[in-house]
């Protein structure tokens, strides 16, 4: 549903009139006002990321042009790519995962999906077939009492140039027909899944559109248009990402006074993707997590931290891109000016093999983040599982006792209520 910018207020009013939607939030299957979202991302399932599943990319570990799902499918060709990916889709996440997710006290999963699963664009190398597995995921969630947020994780042209958009490099999302094709994908996603209101509580219009390389006014117009697309199918909540801006800067946009309803703001909080962040000591990581309360609590719409992690370094194998090193130990090209520690036991391995001090630091960090992010609507940890990145592996961190069970228990209560450093040895 495309609206000329000048007609946005009228279009929103018309959509509300046609659907008989009052401006206040309608009752949904999940009470975002009074319940906390506690969820995990099912990363690496339908949008490949080399660091989550390095085995899929291992044949190009020593060089080559394959660095993301676009180049992966282009290199293999559609037939071979489908064979390999279909096996991956069938095995990476199963019904047993959903059962364990529910057993850990979580109530949501966030499922990243690329546009290519929904809309085929000529000359794209991507393959289709993901939706039958998404259908299964919805059924598994229903069976296990879980809710689902569907997340359009990759847009044509790439909305951020990251490998997690499907294609690394230039940001070209707002060129040509890319935005209209993204809206086609949203429409297809909404038509297929929004009616399943007992399970699908929200549709995220686009993951991490960059505020650089894109026109912010066009991002905002896209959000209105995408909201209109979802509203043709009912009252499912619509999630918008903050485009890496201060969440408070979105106050007044797409709230009830603006004539829209059921909008969730998504912010992602990592402390590993800059030199200054990886240089921080464990106490500084905790304090930074707690300081996020001041940014998310004053927002005027439901606000979730849709991605966060236990990692305090960027050591995980290929986290910065296939074949690339880390800022933390000075091995990332162009970021060799500092050395803050060894990536031993952090580059790859298991939670059990982590150093005791790293386990302790992670446990304190995770508990502080849980306290901070539940100051508003809730959170989704990134990610449920990885092949070899222990600090990012919710399943194994929880099994090892480093993420609390139940989720509201604390080894160290009220870390965000004191200015003192409570992390041992710091």
Swiss-Prot record:
Enzyme Commission code(s) on record: 3.2.1.58
Stored SUPFAM superfamilies: (Trans)glycosidases
Function in brief: Beta-glucanases participate in the metabolism of beta-glucan, the main structural component of the cell wall. It could also function biosynthetically as a transglycosylase.
GO molecular function terms listed in the Swiss-Prot or TrEMBL record: glucan exo-1,3-beta-glucosidase activity
Identification of the protein by name: Glucan 1,3-beta-glucosidase
Active-site residues from the entry: 208, 307
Keywords on record: Cell wall biogenesis/degradation, Disulfide bond, Glycosidase, Hydrolase, Secreted, Signal, Zymogen
Annotated source species: Blumeria graminis
Keyword 4Fe-4S: no
GO cellular component, one term: cell surface
Residues in the signal sequence: 1-20
Lineage summary: Eukaryota, Fungi, Dikarya, Ascomycota, Pezizomycotina
